[in-house]
Amino acid sequence: MFLGTHTPRLDDKGRLILPARFRDQLLDGLVITRGQERCLYIFPMQEFQRMHEEMRQAPLTNKEARDYQRVFLSGASSELPDKQGRVTVPPLLRTYAGLERDVAVIGAGARVELWDLRTWESYLDEVEPAFADRREEVLPGVL
């Protein structure tokens, strides 16, 4: 499980040093792809393969499923961390997420999210106050 927030920097080649806590789970390979809210999702290869199998179950006649798969998979890039725990974030994905140098790497359970640091901070400023004001459970039985 991926937990916590880390604030590394991308180097001049667009490489990210994975947080040490995440490396063991990503050592055998990972997939970086477009996420929602203009972040990137990073999945361990096995988790991505499981998700892909679920996506394949959607009927080809379902336009929303086709659209989602196109957007999600067309930006996907499989990567293998080097000995220093670095992975290259492809230029297409860096542009999509507005990544320059300062980034936030957040644990989101079964996935890691990669955000531009300022965008992440703005997102938290907007969403976090409402977190405590919820009258109903967002995740029934959990919170």
Curated annotation (Swiss-Prot):
Belongs to the MraZ family. One of its GO terms (molecular function) is transcription cis-regulatory region binding. NCBIfam families: division/cell wall cluster transcriptional repressor MraZ. It is found in: Cytoplasm, Nucleoid. One of its GO terms (biological process) is negative regulation of DNA-templated transcription initiation. It comes from the Bacteria. Keywords: Cytoplasm, DNA-binding, Repeat, Transcription, Transcription regulation. One of its GO terms (cellular component) is nucleoid. Pfam families: MraZ (PF02381). It comes from Kineococcus radiotolerans (strain ATCC BAA-149 / DSM 14245 / SRS30216). InterPro entries: MraZ (IPR003444), MraZ_C (IPR035644), MraZ_dom (IPR020603), MraZ_N (IPR035642), MraZ_sf (IPR038619), SpoVT-AbrB_dom (IPR007159), SpoVT-AbrB_sf (IPR037914). This is Transcriptional regulator MraZ. Residues 5-47, 76-119 form the SpoVT-AbrB domain. PROSITE patterns: SPOVT_ABRB (PS51740). Forms oligomers.
